[in-house]
A protein has these predicted regions:
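A charged, aromatic-enriched C-terminal amphipathic alpha-helix characteristic of glycosyltransferases
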Residues: 164-188
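A conserved mid-protein helix/loop that constitutes part of the nucleotide-sugar donor-binding site
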Residues: 30-53, 68-74
Length: 188
């Protein structure tokens, strides 16, 4: 057929799969993503502690960024028994691809001016769990806000979003269902 595409390419799906493969994260795993310098203010520690409380042990916490607390966070993850599910990537130039592979965005900062990472996550369509601070509380309307030290609240918010996200994906955007629909519509 001249000029008619008979296949559908979803770049975001493939880039997300590439990142998961590179990081050793199973394709069926849930991914919680944080982006930012690994320092005390960014408070990634609370994300690691929340991961340890999640019932779904097939959930990974990916932190994109580098900073002075990388080793301390690795040690904390090991001590909580989640060292194999916490990934500190260091500095990355392909952060946009990380948003495509994540299921939930976690922004646990103690303080922030204009939270660019939250805006990027929202623009990528990710549900956001963020601290109730200036900036993020103005932006986050679909997601959950919590106090920076509320580990249980963060864990519960992540689980709630994962469950609702899984239902949405299954019902609305299963890639195989979309491909079958496209084949039926175009008779391919």
């Amino acid at each position: 057929m001249g000029g008619v595409r008979n296949h559908l390419v979803l770049q975001g799906v493939y880039k997300g799969q590439r990142i998961r493969k590179e990081l050793g994260i199973p394709l069926d795993a849930k991914v919680v993503l944080s982006v930012g310098e690994v320092n005390k203010n960014k408070n990634h520690k609370v994300g690691i502690e929340a991961l340890a409380k999640l019932r779904d042990k097939n959930t990974y916490y990916v932190i994109c960024g580098r900073g002075p607390l990388m080793e301390a966070h690795k040690e904390l993850a090991q001590s909580l028994g989640v060292g194999d599910r916490v990934v500190l990537t260091g500095y990355r130039t392909d952060v946009a691809d990380f948003y495509k592979m994540a299921d939930v965005f976690l922004f646990p900062s103690f303080r922030e001016g204009l939270p660019v990472a939250v805006m990027e996550a929202m623009a990528s369509g990710l549900p956001v769990v963020a601290t109730r601070i200036r900036g993020s509380s103005d932006l986050v309307q679909q997601g959950d806000l919590f106090e920076p030290t509320d580990v249980d609240g963060i864990a519960k918010a992540i689980e709630t979003l994962q469950q609702s996200n899984a239902k949405y994906e299954t019902a609305v955007f299963d890639i195989h269902k979309v491909m079958e629909s496209m084949k039926t519509i175009y008779g391919v």
